[in-house]
């Protein structure tokens, strides 16, 4: 099975496990450039900081489920369950949905309304724009202009 299929199937298995534990699945990656391969699962607690206990519970529950699916990943692999870093760069639709309301810094390729860096709370991302709330105002930044969206600890 190719890595993309593994990620899709593990995502389908891991999402309900995370929900049962009161967590959100943020991302799944299967890295084959390491020996053994690494299956990385990122989770977050929706209302408070994600702790080591959350990662441990998710790891044990997912590992037990994966052990019943010996057809999914052939050969040895390491399972790593962690929470996204505080200053994580957001790239996937899943990440943009999981981190709605969080403080972010957006860098653009060129000036948008005279600025190349924006800080605010993430509202959403659609096919055309990334939306932030800045000082109570909704701001739309065109996706083709957005170079990077990164979580930050707090807003200035």
From Swiss-Prot:
InterPro entries: Ribosome_maturation_RimP, RimP_C, RimP_C_sf, RimP_N, RimP_N_sf. Keywords: Cytoplasm, Ribosome biogenesis. One of its GO terms (cellular component) is cytosol. Pfam families: DUF150_C, RimP_N. It is found in: Cytoplasm. CDD domains: YlxS_C. SUPFAM superfamilies: YhbC-like, C-terminal domain, YhbC-like, N-terminal domain. GO terms for biological process: ribosomal small subunit assembly; translation. It comes from the Bacteria. Belongs to the RimP family. PANTHER family: RIBOSOME MATURATION FACTOR RIMP. HAMAP family: RimP (MF_01077). Required for maturation of 30S ribosomal subunits. This is Ribosome maturation factor RimP. The lineage of its organism: Bacteria, Bacillati, Cyanobacteriota, Cyanophyceae, Gloeobacterales. The gene is rimP.
């Amino acid at each position: 099975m190719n890595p993309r299929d593994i990620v899709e199937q593990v995502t389908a298995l891991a999402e309900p496990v995370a929900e049962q534990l009161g967590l959100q699945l943020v991302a799944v990656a299967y890295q084959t450039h390491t020996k053994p391969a690494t299956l990385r699962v990122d989770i977050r607690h929706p209302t408070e900081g994600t702790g080591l206990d959350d990662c441990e519970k998710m790891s044990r529950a997912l590992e037990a489920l994966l052990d019943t699916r010996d057809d999914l990943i052939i050969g040895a692999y390491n399972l790593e369950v962690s929470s996204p870093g505080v200053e994580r760069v957001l790239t996937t639709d899943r990440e943009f949905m999981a981190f709605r309301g969080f403080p972010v810094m957006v860098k653009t390729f060129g000036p948008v309304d005279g600025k190349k860096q924006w800080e605010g709370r993430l509202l959403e991302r659609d096919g055309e724009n990334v939306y932030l709330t800045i000082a109570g105002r909704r701001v739309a930044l065109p996706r083709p202009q957005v170079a990077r969206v990164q979580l930050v600890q707090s807003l200035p």
